[in-house]
From Swiss-Prot:
It comes from Mycobacterium bovis (strain ATCC BAA-935 / AF2122/97). GO terms for cellular component: polyketide synthase complex. The lineage of its organism: Bacteria, Bacillati, Actinomycetota, Actinomycetes, Mycobacteriales. Residues 624-950 are annotated as: Acyltransferase. Pathway: Lipid metabolism; fatty acid biosynthesis. Residues 9-83, 1759-1836 form the Carrier domain. Residues 1106-1115 have a biased composition (Low complexity). The modification O-(pantetheine 4'-phosphoryl)serine is found at S43, S1796. This is Phenolphthiocerol/phthiocerol polyketide synthase subunit A. Residues 1130-1267 are annotated as: C-terminal hotdog fold. Its EC number is 2.3.1.292. The active site is at C273, H408, H448, S720, H1027, D1186. GO terms for biological process: Actinobacterium-type cell wall biogenesis; fatty acid biosynthetic process; phenolic phthiocerol biosynthetic process; phthiocerol biosynthetic process.
C-alpha cells in the first residue's frame, strides 16, 4: 500500500472516485457489489485502469484480475491483501489447499421440511420437541389420479396414504427468480424448492448471492424422482418449449447455477436415497481439487404420484401404521417424506480467512457400492462396513473417536439389523461398555425423505454438534431383538441427551444408503467459534438498517418480518449486529428502504413504519425512481440555530468532529469564542455576531460531514449571508476569509439591532410589489419561491402589512431577526464594508456557484469587498437561482441539500422547482432539524440522498449473527392435466349424484373403502327442475346432501355429523363425480369431464358418518319435541312469493316440485306447510331436503342477502314421508353479520320427524358467485376482469366508422333508391340534394306510408318561450313514436328505414343541442324494438348546412347502423366502449367539513347508500330530498310505521350517530319552485352552503315505443330531465365541487321497453358533457342494476341482456369502488358495467387486448406514446401472465422471465396492434415497456403532430363494441313491456 492508500476502504473509495471521474457515473450510481462490466467498464477501460492501479500500488495489476474479482468490493479486498512470498506461511497454506484431505467448513444451511420447518432453527426445535410430521396424503395431492377407470381407483384405494408432506408445493416466488409464470408452471417444483432454499442457505451463510456471479461456485444437487415431468408430458397438447427444461432432472442443479451465474461444476446426483449425502461428498472433493472455491450441496424430494407408493407397497416396504420406528422391535417399514436441504461449504482455511461462522467441519467422507448382493434393493453388510472404514480413513481419525452416528435408519425389518451390525462392527468395537456409540435417525420425525434424506440427517447432526445435545430417536420403545446393542457397544438415543464429554471436539458420522446400492458416509467435527479481535467489537452509537427488495412490497414484507423477529426470537441480538448482517451479508436489490435508530425500540418502530409505508423518524421509504444527476448544496442565512445543535454529531460522527477541530483555531481568531465549546455544551447563540459566525462554522463542518459520506456538491447556492459559506465551499474564499467576511458583516450590522423588521408573506412577487407600493420604506428583500416573499422595512409598517395580508386569508408572519438586511437601511453600512474588506483577494471557484445577490443570474461575481457590500443590500434572488439550477442550459441539477442546522428553505426549493419544471423529479433535503437527535436526522437525510443504492456503511469485524431470510411472495404454479371425456362413470341416480359403487379393500386391517363414481351432464341432471344462480346452473345443496345421505344409508348409517360445504358444483358442463367413504368419513368431489385448463379435482362437501338407525330415530324424536312445535303466540302470515324471494337473491328456479301451503312466523321461529306432488320418481327425500334448505335460508324474509349453506352439525333421516303434506319447522338460533344458524325439522302432520338438521349454518354472500371460492361461468372471461370493479368503468370512444362492403350482411346495394320523406326542421334543402343523388321525394299526402326512407330532422327550437326541456322532449317523443307506429303498421313487403338527424349533441355546447340529446337514448330503443325499420341516427355539427350533408346522407341511407353516428369534418364516427386508463387527474373525493351536500332521491335505498358513502368521505351535513315526506320525529318510534319507512329512518339515525347532520326534505326536484324554496329556507337559516350534488331521483315506466303516451313519457322525464335542468340552473358551473348524475346503461345499450327512460338518461349524459366543458366537475354515471336494490327495472334488463355475454349486475360495494376509481379521471360520462374480455376463437380470451391498428400519423406525439405504452403493457402483461397494473414500465423484461419464445409471441401481437412489421430482436434491443414504446413511436409517427389533432382511425376491419351489444339486445322479445 502507498501512503495515500492504507487499506481496503481507501482503495474502495479510490476506485469509486476513478469511475465517477473517468467512466461518467455519479457516486450514487456506483454500487460496489455490481460487476465492473455492469458499471460500464469496457475492456479498453480495464487496461487503462490496470495501469493506474499498478502505478498507485507499486505492484503489477493485470486486467485479468478484474475478471477474477469482478466487483469493486472484491477487487479492493484482493488488491489490499498482502502479496504472499514463495516461502511465506500463506504459500504453505495455499499448498495445503490442494490436499485431498483438507477439512471442509459448513458455513451455511437451509431447509424446508413438513411440520412447518422452514429453517435449521425450526428443525432443531421440532426435533427437541419430539414432534412428527407424518400424516395422510393431502386431499388434493392425488386428485389427478383419482379420475381413472374403476380398477385404477381400486388400486389407488389400496395404496398406503401415510407420508410426510409439505404444504403448498404449488407455491413459488417466480417473480423473485425472474421466471415467467408460464415457465414456472412447467418447472418441476423440486427445482423451485431448491432455488428458494438455496437462497436461504446462502443468506444463512452471510454470503450475498449476488457476489457469487461468475465465480467458481459449484452446485451438487441430489434428486431421484421426476414425477412432475412425467405428469406434464402425459398430455402432448400441453407440452411446450418449457416442458423439457422444466421436467429434466439435470436442470435441478443447472437452474441454480444459471440464476446465480455460477461458473463451477453443476451436477445433479441421483443415487436414490443416498443422493444428497453423495452430493455433499462430491462437493467436498470438488473443493479439495479446487474445481470450485465454494460449493452448494443439496437434496430435494417431492411425492407427486401414488405410483412409487404403490411399488413400495407391493414389496411391503412401507409402514401400514404410518410410523418410522427405526431400531424398534415393532418396526414395520418406512414412511415416505418430502423436503429439501441445502448446505454451503468452503475449504476451512478460506472460511477462517473470510471470518465465516463455521457451523461444523467435514473431516472426511466416502462413497461405495453394494455390488451384487441378495438383490438389487437388498443391502450389503460388507459394503456398508467398507464405506465406514473408508470415511474415517479419509478423515484421519480412529473409528472409536466418533461419538454419534446419524444412521440411515429406515425402520425396515431387514435394513435396521444390517446397518446396526455394520456400525457396531466398525465403530463400536473397542469402546468401553459405559461409553457406547450413540445412534439415531431423523426419519423417525420426518419420514424417509429419500433424495433429501442424507442432507436431512446431515443438518440434524450439524445442529446437534453445535448445541452439544442429541435429539431423541422417536418411537423407540423396545429394542429390535435382532440387534445385539450391548455386544455391538451401541445405544439408541431415546431421550434428549447431552453430548458425552470425551476430551476431544464433538464428532459424528452421517450415513445414507441408496436402494440401488450406493452407500455414503460423512464424518463431521465441531467447528471453532469465531470471535472479533479485542477492541474491534465496539458498537456504533447509531445504526442504519438497509432493508432491500426487488419491489416496494417486498421491502415492506422484509421490514415487517424483521420487526417481528427483533421483538421475538432475535430479542437478544444487538442492533449493531442486525445492521451488520443486513447491510453487508444480504444481496443488493433494486428497491430499498432505510431505518436509522439509536436503540432497538426505535429500530423496531421504524421497521413497522417502513412495513406500513408510513413516515416516521429515521425512516426512508423506497424511492419510486431516481431524481437524476446533479447535487446542489444550498446554504441558508440566519434562523436555523438552536441550542444543542451538533452536540451529538461531535460525539458520534468523527468526520464532523474533525472538521470542527480543524476549523477551531481560525474560528476563535475571527469570532472570539470557541465553536467546539458552544456545540459540545449545547449553548445558545446570542446576538447577531454570535449567531452569524456560529452558523457559518456549523455549515462548513456539516459540509465536510456530507462529503465524508461521498455526497459532494456539483453546485452551491447561498441564501443571504449563506452565500459566504457557499463561496468558501466553492473555493472562492478560504475558511478564514469566510469567517472574516461574516464577522465584519455582523459587527457592522449589530448597532442597527431592533431598528427594522422582516416578514414572510404567502404572496408571489408581483402581488407583494403591488402591496408595498404605498410604503416606500418597505422593500421586497427576498424572492423565496413562487408563493413566498420576504419584505424588509420599519417595524410599524411591517406590522401593518402583515395585518393586511392576513385579512386576505393568507399567511404572514414576522421573521425573528435582530437586523433586517436587504433594504435601504444597509446603504449606510456599505462604505465601511468595502473599506474593511478592501484587501480581500478571492480566487476563482472550483465548484459552480450561482449568486443570489444579482437579478441577472449570468453575472459572474468576484467575491471581493464590493460583492459583500452589495450582498447585504440587494434583494435575495433565491427563487430565480433555484429555478435556474433546476433547468439550466448547462444541465439541470436534481438533488438540493440545505446545509443548515434546521431546514428553512426545503419547501421553497421544491415549490420553485415544481413551478419551473412541472412533472420533473427533484429531491429537496435538509441536514439537521431543531430539537431532534442530529445524528439520526443527518443519517436519515443522507439515506434520502441515495436513491439508486444505499450509502456505504463501515463493515464491522466478523462474525455476524444469522437473521431471518428473505420472505417469499408466493403465487400458484402447476400444470394442467386432461383426461378423455366419458372415460369414467355412469349417469347419476335420480335425485342424487351417486353412480357406480365399488368396494375397495385396504392394506391394513381397516374396513374397506367405498367409491361411487358418476358423470354429471348438463342435459342429464338428476333432478327435474332448474337451479340457476346468476344465469349459471348450480347443483342445489339439497341434491348434494341427498347424495351423501344416500351413500351413508347404503353403508348402514342414517345420520351425518360435521357436514362442511366447501365449493358449489357448477353444472353448466360435464363433470366427473366421486363420493368416497372411508373410516367413517365421507366426501364428495368433482372434476371437469373434458380436458380444460381447470381440469383438477374440487372437493365440495365432507362429513362424518354418524349414529345407528335406532340412535338416529331417538335423536329425531327428541329434536322434534324441542323444536318441532310452533310457539303458542304464532300468527299465520300471508304466503310470500317464493319465486320473487329467490329471484331477489339471484336464484332462478327450483330443482324439485313443491309448493308452500301456509306460512306461520313468530320471532325466530317459522313453520311452513308444504305440498308435494303425488308422483315423485326420485322419492320424497330430495324435495323435502330442498324445501328445508331453501326455506331455512329465507327464514328472515326482510334480510335480502343471499345465504348459502356452510355447515351442519348433524343431519338425521327418519322414515320416508308418504303423504302429500309435510311441515318444515325452522328455529333461527343465531343471526349475525356473517350469516345465520337454523335448526330444521321436517315431518308429516302428526308423525315422527322424517328429517332433522341441527345447527344448519348459512353464510352471507356479498357477491353472487363468491369468486374467491368458486369458479365463475366459463363465458365470463378472466376472473380479474369479472371481479375487479375498477375494470367495470368504460368511456365512449368515438372512432371512424367501418364501412361495410357489398357482401356485408348489413350492407345493401342501392341501384334504385326509393322514395324519401324528410320530416321535421328545415328539410327542404336536404330533400333537394337527395333528389340530386337519385332519391325520389315521397308524395307528402301519403308520404310516410309510401316512403322507403324516412328522415326525421330534429327540431332545434322550443315551440314557445314557456316550453321547457321536458315539454320539448315529450312533444318530440310523441311525434317520433307516432312515426314509428305508422311505419310498423306498413306491410312487410314495403320496408322502410327511419333515420334521425340531430345537431351538436356530441359536444352538447348549445342549449338546442342539449335539448335534442334525449333522442340518442330513444334511438337505441327503437333500433332494439324495431330493427326491421331502423336506419340510424346521425349527429351533425351545430352549424352544418343540411343541403351540403345530402350527398353524405345518400351514401349512409343504404347502410343501416345500430350505433349512433357522429359526422364531423366529413368523417363519420361510431362509438365503442373503452376502458378508463392512464394516471388519475385528481385525488379521491374528500368532502369539506363546513359544507353541505344535496342528494336528490336521497330517501330511497340508493340515495341512502350514497349518503353513507359521502359520510365516509368526510361529509358532515347532508340534504336528502324525496317526494314522500317522512313523519315528524316524534312519530319515528311508532310501531305502525311500515318496513320501508322504518328502514329509511334507521338509515338516517345511523348517519346521525356518526356525527352527520341530516336534513330530510320533501321536495319534487323537477319543480323549480320546490328547489328554490328549499334553498331560500337554507339561506334564511344561515345553513352551510351546498358544495356538491348527487342527482339520484328517477322512476321508470316500461312501455314499448309504439305504446308510449305523452303522460307516461312526462312521468319518467320529469325527475331526470326536469330535475337535472333545475339543479343545473340553481348550481351553475363553478358553484359546487362536484355534480354527479345517476343515469342508466339503458341509455347506452337500447333496452326494449325503456324508450322514455333511456331518453331521459341520455339527456343526463349530454348535460354532464356540457357542464364539464364549462369547467365543472360533472359526471354522468350509466349504471347497470345494483344488486339488492334494483336501481330500476331497466337496469335489470340491461343485466339480463349482458349476462348472455358473461356480464352481471353489481353490488353496492363494487359500484362505489368503480365510482371512486373513475372520479379521479377527467371523464364526463362513465358506463359502469362488468364486461369480460372478448374471447378468442378458442374461447380462451387470449386475444382480448388486441385492438385494430391505428392511424398513428394523425395523433399527437404525446398521445402516440401514451397509447403505445398502454397497449404494449396489456400485450406484454398478458403474455408474461402478470397483472397489468403491476407491470412497471421501467422494469427490464428479463427480470420478469422473458425469453425468445415469449418474445416471438409478443412480437406477433404487437405487430397487429401497431400495424407494422417488427424485428425479432425488438424486445431485447428495447427491454422495457417505456423504451419499446419510445422506439415504436419513432417508427409509427416520426414527425411531431399538433396536439389539436387527436382523432385516431381504425382499420377497415374494426367493429364497434356497441354494434355487437345491439346485435345481441335486438333479439329481446316484443312482450318486454312490463311494470315496475
Amino acid at each position: 500500500m502507498t501512503g495515500s492508500i492504507s487499506g481496503e476502504a481507501d482503495l474502495r473509495h479510490w476506485l469509486i472516485d476513478y469511475l465517477v471521474t473517468n467512466i461518467g457515473c455519479t457516486p450514487d450510481e456506483v454500487d460496489p457489489d455490481l460487476s465492473l462490466a455492469d458499471l460500464g467498464v469496457s475492456s479498453r477501460d480495464a487496461v487503462v485502469l490496470s495501469g493506474e492501479l499498478s502505478e498507485l500500488l507499486g505492484r503489477t495489476v493485470s486486467p485479468i484480475d478484474f475478471w477474477e474479482h469482478p466487483t469493486i468490493n472484491a477487487l479492493a479486498a484482493y488488491l489490499a491483501a498482502p502479496e504472499p512470498s514463495p516461502d511465506s506461511d500463506a504459500a504453505v497454506k495455499r499448498g495445503a489447499r490442494n490436499s485431498l484431505d483438507e477439512p471442509i467448513a459448513v458455513v451455511g444451511m437451509g431447509c424446508r421440511f413438513p411440520g412447518g420447518i422452514s429453517c435449521p432453527e425450526a428443525l432443531w426445535d421440532f426435533l427437541c420437541e419430539r414432534r412428527s410430521s407424518i400424516s395422510q396424503v393431502p386431499p388434493q395431492r392425488w386428485q389427478p389420479f383419482e379420475g381413472g377407470p374403476p380398477e385404477v381407483a381400486a388400486a389407488l384405494a389400496r395404496t398406503t396414504r401415510w407420508g410426510s408432506f409439505l404444504p403448498d408445493i404449488d407455491a413459488f416466488d417466480a417473480e423473485f427468480f425472474e421466471i415467467s409464470p408460464s415457465e414456472a408452471d412447467k418447472m418441476d417444483p423440486q427445482q423451485r424448492l431448491l432455488l428458494e432454499v438455496a437462497w436461504e442457505a446462502l443468506e444463512h451463510a452471510g454470503i450475498p448471492p449476488g457476489t457469487l456471479r461468475r465465480s467458481a461456485t459449484g452446485v451438487f444437487a441430489g434428486a431421484c424422482l421426476s414425477e412432475y415431468g412425467a405428469m406434464a408430458s402425459a398430455d402432448l397438447s400441453q407440452v411446450d418449449g418449457w416442458s423439457n427444461s422444466g421436467g429434466a432432472m439435470s436442470i435441478i442443479a443447472n437452474r441454480l447455477s444459471y440464476f446465480l451465474d455460477l461458473r463451477g461444476p453443476s451436477v445433479a446426483v441421483d443415487t436414490a436415497c443416498s443422493s444428497s449425502l453423495v452430493a455433499i461428498h462430491l462437493a467436498c472433493q470438488s473443493l479439495r481439487t479446487q474445481d470450485c472455491h465454494l460449493a452448494i450441496a443439496a437434496g430435494v424430494n417431492l411425492l407427486l404420484s401414488p405410483a412409487v407408493f404403490r411399488g413400495f407397497d407391493q414389496v411391503g416396504a412401507l409402514s401400514p401404521t404410518g410410523q418410522c420406528r427405526a431400531f424398534d422391535a415393532t418396526a414395520d417399514g418406512f414412511v415416505r417424506g418430502e423436503g429439501a436441504g441445502v448446505v454451503v461449504l468452503k475449504r476451512l482455511t478460506d472460511a477462517q480467512r473470510d471470518g465465516d461462522r463455521v457451523l461444523a467441519v467435514i473431516c472426511g467422507s466416502a462413497v461405495t457400492q453394494d455390488g451384487r448382493s441378495n438383490g438389487l434393493m437388498a443391502p450389503n453388510p460388507a459394503a456398508q462396513m467398507a464405506v465406514l472404514r473408508a470415511a474415517y480413513t479419509n478423515a484421519g481419525m480412529q473409528p472409536s473417536e466418533v461419538d454419534y452416528v446419524e444412521a440411515h435408519g429406515t425402520g425396515t425389518l431387514l435394513g435396521d439389523p444390517i446397518e446396526a451390525r455394520a456400525l457396531g462392527t466398525v465403530l463400536g468395537r473397542g469402546r468401553p461398555e459405559d461409553s457406547p456409540l450413540l445412534i439415531g435417525s431423523v426419519k423417525t420425525n420426518l419420514g424417509h425423505t429419500e433424495a433429501a434424506a442424507g442432507i436431512a440427517g446431515f443438518i440434524k447432526t450439524v445442529l446437534a454438534v453445535q448445541h452439544g445435545q442429541i435429539p431423541p430417536n422417536q418411537h423407540f420403545e423396545t429394542a429390535n431383538p435382532h440387534i445385539p446393542f450391548t455386544d455391538l457397544r451401541m445405544k439408541v438415543v431415546d431421550t434428549q441427551t447431552e453430548w458425552p464429554a470425551t476430551g476431544h471436539p464433538r464428532r459424528a458420522g452421517v450415513s445414507s444408503f441408496g436402494f440401488g446400492g450406493t452407500n455414503a458416509h460423512v464424518v463431521i467435527e465441531q467447528g471453532q467459534e469465531v470471535r472479533p479481535a479485542p477492541g474491534q467489537g465496539l458498537s456504533p452509537a447509531v445504526s442504519t438498517l438497509v432493508v432491500a427488495g426487488k419491489t416496494m412490497q417486498r421491502v415492506s414484507a422484509t421490514a415487517g418480518m424483521l420487526a417481528d423477529w427483533m421483538e421475538g426470537p432475535g430479542a437478544d441480538v444487538a442492533l449493531a449486529d442486525v445492521a451488520h448482517t443486513l447491510n453487508h451479508h444480504r444481496s443488493r436489490q433494486p428497491k430499498f428502504g432505510t431505518v436509522v435508530a439509536r436503540d432497538r425500540t426505535q429500530a423496531i418502530a421504524g421497521l413497522r413504519a417502513l412495513a406500513a409505508g408510513q413516515h416516521a423518524p429515521g425512516v426512508v421509504n423506497p424511492a419510486e425512481g431516481s431524481p437524476g444527476p446533479g447535487t446542489v448544496f444550498v446554504y441558508s442565512g440566519r434562523g436555523s440555530q438552536w441550542a444543542g445543535m451538533g452536540r451529538q454529531l461531535l460525539a458520534d460522527e468523527p468526520a464532523f468532529a474533525a472538521a470542527v477541530a480543524e476549523l477551531e483555531p481560525v474560528f476563535v481568531e475571527q469570532a472570539g469564542f470557541s465553536l467546539h465549546d458552544v456545540l459540545a455544551n449545547g449553548e445558545e447563540l446570542v446576538g447577531i455576531e454570535q449567531i452569524q459566525l456560529g452558523l457559518i462554522g456549523m455549515q462548513l463542518a456539516l459540509t465536510e460531514l456530507w462529503c465524508s459520506y461521498g455526497v459532494q456538491p456539483d453546485l452551491v447556492i447561498g441564501h443571504s449571508m449563506g452565500e459566504v459559506a457557499a463561496a468558501v465551499v466553492a473555493g472562492a474564499l478560504t475558511p478564514a476569509e469566510g469567517l472574516r467576511v461574516t464577522a465584519t458583516r455582523s459587527r457592522l450590522m449589530a448597532p442597527l439591532s431592533g431598528q427594522g423588521g422582516m416578514a414572510l408573506l404567502e404572496l408571489d412577487a408581483p402581488t407583494t410589489e403591488a402591496l408595498i407600493a404605498d410604503f416606500p420604506q418597505v422593500t421586497l428583500g427576498i424572492y423565496n419561491s413562487p408563493r413566498q416573499t420576504v419584505i424588509a422595512g420599519p417595524t410599524e409598517q411591517i406590522d401593518e402589512l402583515i395585518t393586511r395580508v392576513r385579512a386576505r386569508d393568507r399567511f404572514a408572519s414576522r421573521v425573528n431577526i435582530e437586523v433586517a438586511p436587504h433594504n435601504p437601511a444597509m446603504d449606510a453600512l456599505q462604505p465601511a464594508m468595502r473599506s474593511e474588506l478592501a484587501d480581500l483577494t478571492p480566487r476563482t471557484p472550483t465548484i459552480g456557484i450561482i449568486s443570489t445577490t444579482y437579478a441577472d443570474l449570468h453575472t459572474q461575481p468576484v467575491f471581493d469587498a464590493e460583492h459583500w457590500a452589495t450582498n447585504m443590500r440587494n434583494p435575495v434572488h433565491f427563487q430565480q437561482a433555484i429555478a435556474s439550477a433546476g433547468s439550466g442550459a448547462d444541465g439541470a441539477y436534481h438533488t438540493f441539500i440545505e446545509i443548515s442546522a434546521h431546514p428553512l428553505l426545503t419547501q421553497a426549493i421544491i415549490d420553485t422547482l415544481h413551478s419551473a419544471q412541472p412533472g420533473a423529479r427533484y429531491t429537496s433535503l435538509g441536514t439537521l432539524q431543531r430539537d431532534t437527535d442530529d445524528v439520526v436526522t443527518f443519517r436519515t437525510n443522507l439515506n434520502k440522498a441515495h436513491t439508486i443504492h444505499p450509502p456505504h456503511t463501515p463493515h464491522p469485524p466478523e462474525p455476524h449473527p444469522p437473521i431471518p431470510t428473505t420472505p417469499w411472495q408466493h403465487t400458484r404454479h402447476w400444470i394442467t392435466t386432461k383426461y378423455p371425456a366419458g372415460s369414467v362413470g355412469s349417469a347419476p341416480r335420480a335425485g342424487t349424484l351417486l353412480g357406480q359403487h365399488t368396494t375397495v379393500a385396504t392394506v391394513s386391517a381397516s374396513p374397506p373403502s367405498h367409491l361411487w363414481q358418476a358423470r354429471l351432464a348438463p342435459d342429464a341432471k338428476p333432478y327435474q327442475g332448474g337451479h340457476r344462480f346468476h344465469q349459471v346452473e348450480v347443483v342445489p345443496a339439497s341434491v348434494v346432501l341427498h347424495t351423501i345421505l344416500s351413500a351413508a344409508t347404503e353403508l348402514g348409517y342414517s345420520a351425518l355429523s360435521e357436514v362442511r360445504f366447501e365449493q358449489p358444483i357448477f353444472a353448466d358442463r360435464p363433470r366427473l363425480i366421486q363420493v368416497v367413504a372411508d373410516n367413517r368419513a365421507i366426501s364428495l368431489a368433482s372434476s371437469p369431464a373434458a380436458g380444460t385448463p381447470s381440469d383438477r379435482w374440487t372437493r365440495h362437501v365432507t362429513a362424518q358418518l354418524s349414529s345407528s338407525p335406532s340412535d338416529s330415530a331417538s335423536s329425531l324424536n327428541e329434536h322434534h319435541r324441542a323444536n318441532g312445535q310452533p310457539p303458542e303466540r304464532a300468527h299465520r302470515d300471508l304466503i310470500p312469493d317464493l319465486a320473487e324471494l329467490l329471484a331477489m337473491r339471484g336464484i332462478d328456479g327450483l330443482p324439485f316440485s313443491w309448493t308452500v301451503a301456509s306460512w306461520t312466523q313468530h320471532s325466530s321461529n317459522l313453520t311452513v306447510a308444504i305440498d308435494l306432488p303425488e308422483a315423485l320418481p326420485e322419492g320424497s327425500t330430495g324435495p323435502l331436503l330442498d324445501a328445508a334448505v331453501h326455506l331455512a335460508a329465507l327464514s328472515d324474509v326482510a334480510d335480502s342477502r343471499l345465504y348459502v349453506p356452510a355447515s351442519i352439525e348433524q343431519i338425521s333421516l327418519g322414515d320416508v314421508v308418504t303423504g302429500p303434506r309435510s311441515s318444515v319447522t325452522l328455529n333461527r338460533t343465531a343471526h349475525d353479520d356473517d350469516g345465520i344458524t337454523v335448526d330444521v325439522t321436517v315431518a308429516a302432520h302428526g308423525e315422527v320427524p322424517s328429517l332433522s338438521m341441527r345447527s344448519l349454518r348459512y353464510r352471507a354472500l356479498d357477491f353472487g358467485l363468491d369468486v374467491g371460492r368458486a369458479q365463475p361461468p366459463a363465458s365470463t372471461g378472466p376472473v380479474e376482469a369479472y371481479c375487479d370493479a375498477t375494470n367495470f368503468v368504460h368511456t365512449i370512444d368515438w372512432q371512424p366508422q367501418t364501412v361495410p362492403d357489398a357482401t356485408h350482411p348489413g350492407a345493401e346495394q342501392v341501384t334504385h333508391p326509393g322514395p324519401v320523406a324528410i320530416i321535421g326542421d328545415d328539410g327542404a334543402a336536404l330533400c333537394e340534394t337527395l333528389e340530386g343523388a337519385g332519391y325520389q321525394p315521397a308524395v307528402m299526402s301519403d308520404g310516410v306510408s309510401q316512403a322507403r326512407y324516412v328522415v326525421y330532422v330534429a327540431d332545434s327550437d322550443p315551440a314557445g318561450a314557456d316550453e321547457t326541456d321536458v315539454d320539448f322532449a315529450v312533444r318530440i317523443c310523441t311525434e317520433i313514436t307516432g312515426l314509428v307506429r305508422t311505419l310498423a303498421e306498413r306491410d312487410a313487403d314495403k320496408p322502410a328505414a327511419l333515420w334521425i338527424l340531430t345537431r351538436g349533441v356530441h359536444e352538447s355546447v348549445a342549449p338546442s343541442a342539449l335539448r335534442q340529446s334525449f333522442l340518442w337514448g330513444l334511438a337505441g330503443v327503437i333500433a332494439a324494438e324495431h330493427p326491421e325499420l331502423w336506419g340510424g341516427l346521425v349527429d351533425l355539427a351545430i352549424n352544418d348546412d343540411l343541403g351540403e350533408f345530402g350527398p353524405a346522407l345518400a351514401e349512409l341511407l343504404a347502410k343501416p347502423s345500430k350505433s349512433i353516428l357522429v359526422r364531423r369534418d366529413g368523417v363519420v364516427l361510431a362509438p365503442a366502449l373503452a376502458p378508463v386508463r392512464g394516471e388519475p387527474a385528481r385525488k379521491s373525493l374528500q368532502c369539506r367539513p363546513d359544507a353541505a351536500y344535496l342528494i336528490t332521491g336521497g330517501l330511497g335505498a340508493l340515495g341512502l347508500l350514497m349518503a353513507d358513502w359521502l359520510a365516509d368521505r368526510g361529509a358532515h351535513r347532508l340534504v336528502l330530498t324525496g317526494r314522500t315526506p317522512l313523519p315528524p320525529r316524534r312519530d319515528w318510534q311508532l310501531d305502525t310505521l311500515d318496513t320501508e319507512l322504518r328502514r329509511r329512518i334507521d338509515a338516517i339515525r345511523a348517519l346521525e350517530m356518526r356525527g352527520v347532520t341530516v336534513e330530510a326534505v320533501a321536495a319534487d326536484v323537477g319543480c323549480r319552485e320546490d328547489v328554490q324554496a328549499l334553498l331560500a329556507a337554507r339561506d334564511r337559516d344561515g345553513a352551510a352552503p351546498i358544495r356538491g350534488i348527487i342527482h339520484a331521483a328517477g322512476i321508470t315506466n316500461d312501455q314499448l315505443v309504439t305504446s308510449m303516451t305523452g303522460d307516461a313519457v312526462r312521468q319518467v322525464m320529469w325527475p331526470k330531465i326536469g330535475g337535472s335542468q333545475v339543479l343545473h340552473d340553481a348550481f351553475p358551473p363553478g358553484s359546487v365541487d362536484f355534480f354527479y348524475l345517476t343515469a342508466s346503461a339503458a341509455g347506452i345499450f337500447g333496452i326494449p321497453g325503456q324508450g322514455s327512460y333511456a331518453a331521459a338518461n341520455s339527456y343526463l349524459d349530454a348535460l354532464a358533457r356540457a357542464r364539464r366543458q364549462q369547467g365543472c366537475h360533472t359526471m354522468s354515471l350509466d349504471w347497470v342494476a345494483w344488486r339488492g336494490l334494483g336501481l330500476a327495472a331497466d337496469a335489470q334488463l340491461v343485466s339480463e341482456e349482458l349476462a348472455r355475454m358473461g356480464s352481471r349486475d353489481i353490488t353496492p360495494s363494487e359500484a362505489f369502488t368503480a365510482w371512486e376509481f373513475v372520479d379521479g379521471y377527467d371523464v364526463a360520462q362513465a358506463v359502469v358495467v362488468p364486461m369480460p374480455a372478448p374471447a378468442g376463437a378458442d374461447g380462451s380470451g387470449a386475444n382480448a387486448y388486441l385492438l385494430p391498428a391505428r392511424n398513428w400519423s394523425v395523433m399527437a406525439a404525446t398521445e402516440v406514446r401514451s397509447e403505445l405504452e398502454q397497449g404494449l403493457r396489456r400485450i406484454i402483461a398478458a403474455e408474461l401472465r402478470v397483472p397489468e397494473k403491476e407491470l412497471d414500465t421501467d422494469r427490464p423484461f428479463a427480470e420478469l422471465g422473458l425469453n425468445s419464445l415469449m418474445a416471438m409471441a409478443i412480437r406477433r401481437e404487437a405487430e397487429q396492434f401497431v400495424g407494422i412489421e417488427l424485428s425479432a430482436t425488438m424486445l431485447f434491443n428495447h427491454p422495457t415497456v417505456k423504451s419499446l414504446a419510445s422506439y415504436l413511436a419513432k417508427r409509427v409517427a416520426p414527425h411531431d403532430v399538433s396536439q389539436d389533432n387527436q382523432i385516431s382511425a381504425l382499420s377497415s376491419s374494426a367493429g364497434s363494441v356497441l354494434d355487437s351489444l345491439f346485435d345481441r339486445i335486438e333479439s329481446a322479445p316484443p312482450e318486454a313491456e312490463r311494470s315496475v
